[in-house]
Amino acid sequence: MRRGLVTFAAGGLVSAVTAVVMPENPVFCGVLTFMGMATLLSVPVKSLLRRIPPQLGLALSIALFMLLRDVNDGFLGFEGVRIAAIPDGTDWFTAVLGFPPPGFHSSDYFPLLPWLFLFWTGVFLSRLRPERDDLLLRPIPLFTAMGRHSLLIYLAHQPLLYALMPAVVKLL
């Protein structure tokens, strides 16, 4: 629960900063916000997800992801195969669900639909992997440190790239 709240809050911070610093390209419902929401929404249904056989859960999650892949563009279907049209969203709340209103723009947009089903695909895949303690015999300190600080690294990468790009352009 804590991890979901922290990730969701980090996504809110990114949204607030981009709304001020880059108002022409704000981030609304970006990947961090989504991952926080998906984690928080998965907590109350965790026991239900565990009761679903992993092969069935994997197949259903993939099928629902594919069916809902293009809801953001106003139809059910996958990669341009239009099964049925769906109405536009009406506000920010419907945009979070996956139904953006006309004129909606976000430079990073990962709404609950369809992405929650891809998230749950990972949940079911993790249950299918064999249990092996010897998969990585000894930890690699650099990777361990990066894993412990991955949110901070993610939050720092964009401002760092924006700061370095003018120097890189001058060198070219």
Set out the residue ranges of the language-model regions.
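Alpha-helical transmembrane segments and their immediate juxtamembrane cytosolic regions
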Residues: M1-L172
